Amino acid sequence: MSKLSNVMTGLSFGLVLILSQAGASDVLSSPEQTNNASGGLDYANAIPMDIRATFSEAAVQRVTEPVSFGEPGVSPGAKGNGEKLHEYLGEVGTVVSMQNVAVPSEHGTANRPYATTRVDMFGQRLSRKFPNRITGKLFFKKGTDTYVCSASSIKKGIVVTAAHCIYDNSADKFYTEWEFIPAFYADSKVGLKAPYGKYKSLKAWVPSAYANPTDNVVNDYDVGVLVMKKRPNPDTGTNMYPGERTGFYGYGWNGWGYTNGLNDGSIGLIHQLGYPVSHDHGWQMQANDSQAEKVTVNLGSGNTAMAIMIGSRETGGSSGGPWLFNYGQIGALSGTSAGTYPNNDIVVAVTSWGWGSDDPKEQGATPFTDANVKLVVDGACSDTPDRCD
């Protein structure tokens, strides 16, 4: 049995990752979250979620057998109205100096080039601008401790993140008290800020194949969604879901946007967003660009898992952050035309795991399929359609 090391608490647990197709009913939802009071989360001292693989890098392989899924699909995003709330969350103690230039392309021992840099540069708070503002930090409780991941909106009231930021399959139970803060920002001058407000969750959804403690499926199903509550603006009287203010990304599944679907060797250009604590203490949004490749991970004993691999310097705290195709806004075209899969700002995976060693500078993610992301989004939207219409 292959093992992953869960470094968020220093504990280890065995995980077997197997490739299978989930049925339409194979989803698990949390109890409704009834705590609407503020003050229960420790924003300044939250512990980053961080899943690290301890199997050999040689386990990453490329196989020739084609992978069969349904047709590629996509659900488009929207811009939102941009209304700010400017909530203050408390003080911080360590000075963060501004970085004014993007870093050059680099790579680790995995030989996957990447460029990781702050989103905010040249004194400009670009993290508050569309489409960056759709991404944010996700705080939640594991017992009495506050943990943190990254996340983003993919419907006006639906937030996507990694399943391991929602469900503890070592204890076979959901975490609690999730709170999403889009465009989170902090430094020693302004403290901890929520420019578009903070949003509590109503309920969480994960694939049952991930939650099943017997199978311990992770890589093929490490994606989940949160159904959010509205947040009132005391200045304007409006009451909105996060995606109504910040906008929301689209999402694609079953190989949407890749050069050869979900077959091994298929590639795409990923723009990754998140809040790794290894960069600016996790106070500022980081962006990473890298070519993604679909591979098969050989876990031994006949078990394999799908993975999308990129080069990245991001670490713990980036879990659940979006991996996007076609990031930004296409210009007015003249004398040329858009290529295949031209939709902008489409999430096709979320940050899932990295290696135990820092040397590879590589991260892996579950590719979105109709057996994971579409399954949980459809379940959440069927249960609470007002978050999705």
Regions found by a protein language model. Give the residues of each.
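Bacterial N-terminal signal peptides that target proteins for export
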Residues: 1-11
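Bacterial N-terminal signal peptides
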Residues: 10-20
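Protease-domain processing segments flanking chymotrypsin-fold serine proteases, especially trypsin-like
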Residues: 24-150, 379-389
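Conserved catalytic-core segment of clan PA serine endopeptidases
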Residues: 111-133, 139-148, 154, 175-238
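Terminal peptide-recognition signature
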Residues: 138, 151, 157, 161, ...
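Chymotrypsin/trypsin-fold serine protease catalytic domain
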Residues: 219-311
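Catalytic nucleophile loop of clan PA
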Residues: 312-350
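C-terminal cap/linker of serine protease catalytic domains
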Residues: 344-389
